Design a protein with these regions (language model features):
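Short beta-strand segments
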Residues: 45, 79-81, 134, 152-154, ...
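Residue-level preference for the first positions of well-ordered beta-strands
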Residues: 73-77, 130, 149-151, 172
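A contiguous loop/helix-start segment that scaffolds small-molecule binding in enzyme catalytic cores
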Residues: 144-186
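Short gly/pro/ser/thr-enriched loop/turn and capping motifs at secondary-structure boundaries
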Residues: 20-22, 49, 111-114, 181-183
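Conserved beta-strand scaffold positions in the cores of enzyme catalytic domains, especially
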Residues: 41-43, 104, 133, 173-175
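Class I SAM-dependent methyltransferase SAM-binding "motif I" and its flanking Rossmann-like core
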Residues: 85-146
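Class I S-adenosyl-L-methionine
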Residues: 1-102
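Solvent-exposed alpha-helices and their adjacent loops that cap or buttress functional pockets
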Residues: 5-6, 70-71, 78, 123-127, ...
Length: 186
């Protein structure tokens, strides 16, 4: 419960959404942390785009808002889903904050694909098996040639296309959407 204790101690919570009520990470934290209503919030909207210039501008803007709070002597907790080191917007913002000389720390989470494997009662890799984590918002055709288990992440925006590719390649697939949440689908 290191994450819960950290959120309880931090007076400012950064939420990666237009409004915290839209953030799954906020709803999860609010169910675990008693004093969430006492917090100040930074709603840090990051657009879903591959345009590096737009993304970098948003990362800089988010880092600036967090640094403003740090300059006031306040600690800030940034909410993420899963593990912040795997395809998380936080890592881009964290690098900027670190480069500006501020101390940061990361509390590991449970990667969604590990939670999904547990839910399915399946191993991701045994002995010498390879495990490949692939962002399916990019071209997955080449990645499907890799040996071992392939985990396709971030596929929501291209789900129909991903399904077609998997069907075409006759790949054995197991899928969980919103693993561990009320609207989970297997």
């Amino acid at each position: 419960y290191k994450a819960v204790r950290t959120i309880e101690k931090c007076p400012v919570i950064a939420v990666p959404a237009k409004g915290r009520e839209h953030a799954v990470s906020y709803r999860i934290a609010a169910g675990m942390v008693d004093n969430m209503e006492e917090k100040e919030y930074l709603d840090l909207d990051t657009p879903m785009t591959k345009d590096r210039q737009i993304l970098n501008q948003n990362y800089e803007k988010a880092a600036k808002r967090i640094i403003e709070e740090l300059e006031k002597g306040k600690d800030v907790a940034y909410l993420t889903l899963g593990d912040p080191t795997i395809y998380s917007t936080y890592m881009y913002i964290q690098r900027i904050i670190k480069e500006k000389g501020y101390e940061t720390s990361i509390i590991n989470g449970i990667p969604s694909f590990c939670a999904a494997a547990s839910k399915l009662n399946e191993s991701l890799a045994d002995r010498a098996d390879e495990l490949h984590v692939i962002p399916s918002s990019y071209d997955i055709r080449n990645a499907l040639r890799y040996p071992g288990t392939k985990v396709l992440m971030k596929s929501a925006s291209r789900l129909a296309e991903v399904r077609e590719i998997l069907k075409e390649k006759n790949v054995d697939v197991k899928m969980i959407e919103n693993c561990g949440m009320a609207d989970e689908q297997i």
